[in-house]
Amino acid sequence: MTGMSSSMLGMTSIGVELPDDTFGDESRIGLPFIFVSRYILQYSETLDDALSYIADVHRMCHLIIGIADGKLNTARMIQYSHSKVAFFDDLNLQPYAEWHPRIPNAVYNGMDWLCPSYQYKLYQQITAKYGQITPEYTIQNITAVVKTGDVHVAVYDLTENILYVANGRASNEQGPKAAYDRQFIKLDMNVEYARIQP
């Protein structure tokens, strides 16, 4: 699940199938993440607002969440479960392993918590153009090379409020199946946010 807000927050999440013992437990009781995500994108003005809400909400499942703040040029990765939540930046990013090294001023996660091949390939693609990564580079050389985003890929330029998005092929469509191999559309969210609602 992904989203972008008019307060220059970008958010993404992925379910965790390969947790380690640092995750804590899951529960069927709590606020479903779709509503957590909507609240954050609708009401949070800053990264701190979003993190505070996540810390206090009745969480349910294992997720990895990324939230970036275009106003502050910073981001956090969040280890999210019913009984535990942990917030990571570039200095304490987890899981810390040879296959998931830390990168100054960056947080990243590839496909799952314990997923060495995706994590390391993502690390390689980020560091190949470190400091010069553009949305176009991300689309052509990160998501497509790492092969992450079968169903959906969203790339945010939070400083310019531009969203690039691709979706996997529907059953009645032709062309590549995976979203990362398909055509991206570019949306100027400044225009979208300025639209007058009917």
Locate each region found by the language model.
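A contiguous strand-loop segment
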Residues: 1-34, 60-65, 132, 151, ...
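C-terminus-biased signal that marks the final domain/tail of proteins
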Residues: 41-198
